Swiss-Prot record:
It is found in: Cytoplasm. The keyword Glycoprotein does not apply. The gene is sepF. Gene3D superfamilies: SepF-like protein. This is Cell division protein SepF. GO terms for biological process: division septum assembly; FtsZ-dependent cytokinesis. The keyword Cell cycle applies. Residues 34-57 have a biased composition (Polar residues). It comes from Streptococcus pneumoniae (strain Hungary19A-6). GO terms for cellular component: cytoplasm. Cell division protein that is part of the divisome complex and is recruited early to the Z-ring. Probably stimulates Z-ring formation, perhaps through the cross-linking of FtsZ protofilaments. Its function overlaps with FtsA.
């Protein structure tokens, strides 16, 4: 395979397929398409493929959900409730994400998990947080605050002198390098 072929395949990977795009149409304007007698007439490009339509509807629903949560925060004057969770295994993370999807704030304390389990759980929660447009903030060495899009958290960065000595729960979203 030549370098040119590889380069062409690389470019083709990042270009969009014409079938999956929906052309912009102006209302009440006739569209004229010339048809050659030697070619068969193409199917109309107005119909997106099934997978593209499903993706667009999922994105639309996600944006609608984010707007709904933002509007609720502006008009609600109710008290805010923060759920406190002490996960003991990785499977508890799905319950925490369900609470976040229900527009609740969750304080998560990983003191009953091993460091490896807690990192794995944090990775899962961080991914769900990005999908649901939430916020994940570290508030203590083993505690994280997970909030929906309509809650703003301001955490003052305080370094306690004995916090650095206690390396037992010093896990964070960043990976430690093995030396």
């Amino acid at each position: 395979m030549s370098l040119k072929d590889r380069f062409d395949r690389f470019i083709d990977y990042f270009t969009e397929d014409e079938d999956s795009t929906v052309p912009y149409e102006k209302g009440n304007e006739p569209v004229f398409t010339p048809v050659n007698s030697s070619q068969e007439p193409d199917l109309p490009m107005n119909q997106p493929s099934q997978s593209a339509g499903a993706k667009d509807s999922n994105i639309t629903r996600l944006h609608a959900r984010q707007q709904e949560l933002a509007n609720q925060s502006q008009r609600s004057t109710d008290k805010v409730i923060i759920d406190v969770r002490y996960p003991r295994k990785y499977e508890d993370a799905t319950e925490i994400v369900d609470l976040l999807a229900g527009n609740e704030s969750i304080l998560i304390d990983f003191q009953y998990m091993t460091e490896v389990q807690a990192r794995r759980c944090l990775d899962y929660l961080d991914g769900a947080c990005h999908v649901l447009a939430g916020n994940l903030k570290k508030v203590a060495s083993t505690m994280y605050l997970l909030t929906p899009v309509n809650v703003i958290v301001n955490v003052e960065d305080i370094r306690l002198p004995d916090e650095e000595q206690n390396g037992e729960f010093g896990f964070d979203m960043k990976r430690n390098r093995v030396r």
